[in-house]
Amino acid sequence: MEPTPMLRDRDHDDAPPTYEQAMGLCPTTVSTPPPPPPDCSPPPYRPPYCLVSSPSPRHTFDMDMMEMPATMHPTTGAYFDNGWKWTFALLVVAILGIIFLAVVFTVVINRDNSTATGTSSG
């Protein structure tokens, strides 16, 4: 047995928005705030924050580098002279970390196996 379809009452449906309303092209009325009373004092003056706060140290470094002439800047290769040392150090640390994890893993596996079989080392 098929369910009976729900019939819509089209008289109570809202009309869809017009193209202008949907695209935001219809004229909008913007109400301005009422003028303040004549005896009202203006808000206190606050200078912009960019004039009050000091720049962060990184921006200070960037500004200092910009003030240096381009001929005094270090060459690009100077930044990579010690790169091989850092690469080697990172490789050694990674290998030591893998060895450490392997040792911990085998100790945990052996401990679980010894408790499961009922043998105790010692």
UniProtKB/Swiss-Prot annotation:
Tagged with keyword Transcription regulation: no
Function as written in the Swiss-Prot or TrEMBL entry: Plays a role in the inhibition of host innate immune response to promote latent infection. Mechanistically, suppresses viral DNA-triggered signaling by impairing DNA binding and oligomerization of CGAS. Also impairs the translocation of host STING1 from the endoplasmic reticulum to perinuclear punctate structures which is an essential step for its activation. Regulates the function of host NEDD4 family ubiquitin E3 ligases through its PPxY motif and thereby prevents the excessive ubiquitination of gB and its degradation by inhibiting these E3 ligases.
Keywords: Host cytoplasm, Host membrane, Host-virus interaction, Inhibition of host innate immune response by virus, Membrane, Transmembrane, Transmembrane helix, Viral immunoevasion
Keyword DNA-binding carried by entry: no
Assembly and binders: Interacts with host ITCH; this interaction induces the ubiquitination and subsequent degradation of ITCH. Interacts with host STING1. Interacts with CGAS.
Family: Belongs to the Cytomegalovirus UL42 protein family.
Superkingdom classification of source: Viruses
UniProt-annotated stretches for the region Disordered: 1-47
Pro residues composition-biased segments: 32-47
Protein name: Protein UL42
Subcellular location: Host membrane; Host cytoplasm
